[in-house]
């Protein structure tokens, strides 16, 4: 499903979505454009290999009371310099189960996320994609504002060179960031010399 027009809102509520697309290298499963809002509530969504849930720059995503199997949930924007950088305004996952193969947050060069909220949810990295650079937070050379994880289970056994919870590879921005993890079970690992939680 593709609605790549800016400033829109897509709501998926009380639905069961299972894609039967052939396996490809594309990463579009459900997509909305820049400055758009994507809301998934009380739904079950299963997307095949490399199919993801995406928003454009300066968008937001909310997942509530849902069960998702997807390649990732992210803003996918790559900039050539910090001057052109894009930001995911807010990502909320509440009372949901997510099996992911890639980023939860911002994906791409200089891409950042302002706020991530994960409450009463389970997020696991799919065993098929343990080679991926999976991060909850900002993208390559990007940053994050705040990450709040409460009453949840997070399992990311390998994040490649990325930080599992925080920013992606090689943070560029110098900014104040906050991570709060409360009443949760977190199992994460980073394959490089950087931290598993925080800023690489």
Predicted regions and their residues:
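Surface-exposed loop/turn motifs in large extracellular/passenger domains
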Residues: 1-21, 29-49, 54-200
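Beta-rich catalytic cores
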Residues: 26
């Amino acid at each position: 499903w593709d609605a790549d027009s800016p400033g829109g809102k897509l709501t998926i509520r009380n639905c069961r979505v299972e894609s039967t697309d052939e396996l490809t290298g594309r990463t579009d499963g459900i997509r909305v454009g820049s400055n758009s809002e994507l809301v998934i509530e009380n739904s079950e969504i299963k997307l095949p290999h490399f199919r993801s849930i995406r928003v454009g720059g300066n968008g937001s995503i909310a997942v509530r009371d849902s069960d998702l199997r997807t390649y990732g949930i992210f803003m996918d924007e790559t900039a050539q310099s910090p001057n052109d950088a894009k930001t995911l305004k807010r990502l909320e996952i509440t009372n949901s189960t997510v099996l992911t193969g890639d980023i939860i947050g911002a994906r791409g060069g200089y891409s950042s996320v302002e706020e991530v909220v994960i409450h009463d949810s389970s997020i696991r990295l799919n065993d098929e994609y343990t080679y991926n650079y999976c991060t909850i937070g900002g993208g390559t050379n990007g940053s994050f504002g705040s990450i709040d994880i409460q009453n949840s289970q997070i399992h990311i056994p390998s994040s490649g060179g990325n930080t599992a919870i925080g920013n992606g590879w090689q943070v560029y921005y110098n900014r104040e960031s906050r991570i709060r993890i409360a009443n949760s079970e977190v199992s994460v690992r980073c394959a490089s010399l950087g931290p598993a939680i925080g800023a690489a």
